Amino acid sequence: MGQKVHPIGIRLGVVKKHNANWYASPKQYSEYLINDIQVREYLRKKLDSAMISKIMIERPTGAAKITIATARPGIVIGKKGEDIERLQKELTKIMGVPAQVNIEEITSPDLDAHLVAEGIASQLERRVMFRRAMKRAVQNSMRSGAKGIKVELSGRLGGAEIARTEWYREGRVPLHTLRADIDYSSVRAETTYGTIGVKVWIFRGEILDGMNSVYNPVKEEQTRAPKRRGRGNGNRRNTDRG
């Protein structure tokens, strides 16, 4: 039976970057990991309406740097930067070191898999027909410039007695091509009939010309001998006399 690998996990170090960049001793590793989870849960709960996609955490010596990718930066920053200053103080308490918060604006929310999945989940919770929510999300993403998109819903769709899985795809979604820039996310929608799982894959184009260009290798010199031209077969006179 075939199994599917995580589309982002298999591309880490190739065309994708880790959401947490830090080094720790074996004794500190679990402490840092739990602390990262606490920070992410706190930010997603506090900034629920800010349309947050990713939270990147870096830990330079004696400090912490948190980058929040959001489609609504104004909600995070607040009036005259008051909200972001308050946020930095709270994160400093949680992490135990001075925390710096940076905001990264998402200019195309329809090309971000997490925001698309959250949008579908919120529509399902408002009792919008699941097929309409799927097709609307697919059309908006393709209109925004996506090369391909796939949406999959699992659960008691439409309040059915038996749970099932339905999916809708448009364009190309090459999961086996490592140079393909594929964004993926899974979100849960809590409906009156139970939990519905929402998965979204978005293909945004290829990043690299070839796999070797990731490591910037030295180009191999041409070792083949140059081709020899013939002895002017094309310049021979036509001596046939008819």
Swiss-Prot record:
GO terms for molecular function: mRNA binding; rRNA binding; structural constituent of ribosome. The gene is rpsC. GO terms for cellular component: cytosolic small ribosomal subunit. PROSITE patterns: KH_TYPE_2, RIBOSOMAL_S3. Residues 39-107 form the KH type-2 domain. SMART domains: KH. CDD domains: KH-II_30S_S3 (cd02412). One of its GO terms (biological process) is translation. Gene3D superfamilies: 3.30.300.20, Ribosomal protein S3, C-terminal domain. This is Small ribosomal subunit protein uS3. Belongs to the universal ribosomal protein uS3 family. PANTHER family: 30S/40S RIBOSOMAL PROTEIN S3, SMALL RIBOSOMAL SUBUNIT PROTEIN US3C. Keywords: Ribonucleoprotein, Ribosomal protein, RNA-binding, rRNA-binding. Residues 218-242 are annotated as: Disordered.
